[in-house]
Amino acid sequence: MVRRLADLAYFEHVSRFADRFCDLVGREGSWPPAGVAGAGSIREALWSKARRRKAVIVTDGLRLDLARLVADRLEGEVSLDAVATTLPTNTPFGMAALLPLPAEGPAVSFAGGKASISAGEVSGLETRDGRKAFLLRALGGPKGAGVGFVDLGALLQRQPVPESPLVVVF
């Protein structure tokens, strides 16, 4: 009974918050609000050619305090950027927004009731494999040697880091 009452109170609070948030977005007429950096604002810095090897850690929903702890433990030059998420806020859209997209941006289809994201000739950006295929095509060079991938879990288990100039950690 107590749990049910707590759930009802929480639902009411979250519902009011969601309504106010939707009102804000509606009033602004765009996202993110003026003066707030969006995911697209760091895109060029993420994927620009570096003078030396570079790693980009792409993670979903990492709290800023935890991101700072990770940054403190990394060696070498580290930059940490916090940006407003995309709308909608789920993983497929947020991760695709960080890719080196063409100027016209991604194309989104809701055919069959499920989101499908594509950019240029690459579809499936809503999946990790689709995002990897896109990055290989956009940054990998003729044989894909310009970019390597490693999963964060495997990296934490001491899997070797690819020798490529750009390493993307998912």
Pin down the residues of each PLM region.
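…; additionally, a secondary subgroup of soluble metalloenzymes is captured
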Residues: 1-54, 61-170
